[in-house]
Every structure is written in structure tokens, then in C-alpha cells.
């Protein structure tokens, strides 16, 4: 054959033939075909059906690179790292291969959206393990080290101007999408909106304005406040209890949003009898 020194595994998913090729020196890749197949199934069923007849993932002395229907990945001996890079390069089949956003201008629409979907895929693949149960919050754990006051840059900057592309291109936009999904819109409304974005802009070239407009129209919420904070500025979340007053036997808690970022508010309450309660107030409480 053309590559006699490579091992070849094959499987399929709904008419798509899935190939993995790897060197004998990378026996860990025996699981790779399953990783590709389960990732392709997840992305297809959760977001947008994979439209091509083949998908090939090849192991080699590379960092990771994607092309239509073929990806190149490093050996990555650690199982979690291997699954992540395989699923990440696979995810690029959706962005920017199917939905052709301009990664040279807006990496957050490419690497960021892809990081968002592949973290969710990793959580599913490793479900029930400490890694699977925590991987989606990985970008949040990076926040303190990368969102440094006076140094952090807005996502909207061109990548050539970025001093921390790992944060502005990959991790912060993934955190942004997670926050929009789990905290602002809710999972059902977000998923319906993002699926429609992928469907509407498949084989086209959306700009940020196209994405904003579609998410607004499908979700039914004006999200300008959200995009302004996350993409056009480096706003921070700073919610506070301003004061507590007693009136008519009841206590009133006065809250304020002191930062430039507007999000729902979560508050723990302790009552006179010692019982506690955690309440979440929706983002609309700030009278957007």
C-alpha cells in the first residue's frame, strides 16, 4: 500500500466511513477510531449532521492540523489529551469547514466555537469520571491567569494583534459560549439557537454580526449587552450586596452590578431558623 508502515482501523457512522491511521510506535491509537466515531456522532446529533462520505484521522509527528475530511494529530500518550486533540481537530469539520467563518479575522468564531463543542464532547466521552465531570469548567480555571487587568485584550482584536491567542482565540470564547448556554439562555434555548446558526450558515461565510443577529432572532433575547462585555471589551463581573434593611418585619436586600459584565446573580440566603437557600435571579433583573 501507499503507507505500509501505518496501521489502519476503519468503522462507520450512518454512511460515513471513518479511518484512523497510526504508526506501530503509537499503540495507544487503537482506541482512536472509537474516539473519532463517537465525536462524529455527538457533533452530528447534537449540532449538525456530518455531510461528507469519509473522515480520516492520522497520527504522526505533528501538533494537530485540520483539512476537509482529514486531520493530523500527535501521538498524545495520555488518553485524555489524545481524545481532546482528536476531537478538537475533528470539530473543525464544523467550524470553519462547514460554517466558513474567517479564522484570520475572528478566531473566536473558529477555534473558540470548536473548543466549546469539543469540551462538551470530552465531558460526554469520559462521563462518570473525575475528568469528564470537570473538563467543561477548564476555561474558567484559566481565567485568573489570563484575564489580567491592564493586559487582557478584547476578543475582537485581529489575531496578529493578540499577545495571548490561547486565551482570546480558544479558551475565553469557549467560556463565553458555556456561560451563554448554562447561565443566560439556558441549555434548550441556546442549543436551538446554535443549531440554527450552523444550519443557516452552512457552506457560507458568516461575520460576527450574522452570528449575533441569528442568536438574537432565534433565542428571542437581545444579547447586545452580552457580546459587548465578552467580545468588544474586557469587562469583569462584579456583583455586590449594597445594603440590607429591615422594614415591616421583613428584610430587604439591595443588590448592585458594579462591573461592566451583566450576568444572572446567584445568592445564598440564611434564615432565622438556620435553614439555607440558594436562589438564582435571571439576567433580566438588571433591567437590560
Predicted regions and their residues:
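Hydrophobic helix-coil surface modules that form long, contiguous segments used
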Residues: 1-87, 116
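Loop/turn elements at helix/coil->beta-strand transitions in domains of secreted/extracellular proteins
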Residues: 15-17, 49-55, 91, 172, ...
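Active-site rim elements
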Residues: 25-30, 102-104, 160-167, 197-202
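Acidic/His/Gly-enriched intrinsically disordered linker/tail segments
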Residues: 105, 111-179, 183-184
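Amphipathic alpha-helical substructures
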Residues: 166-253
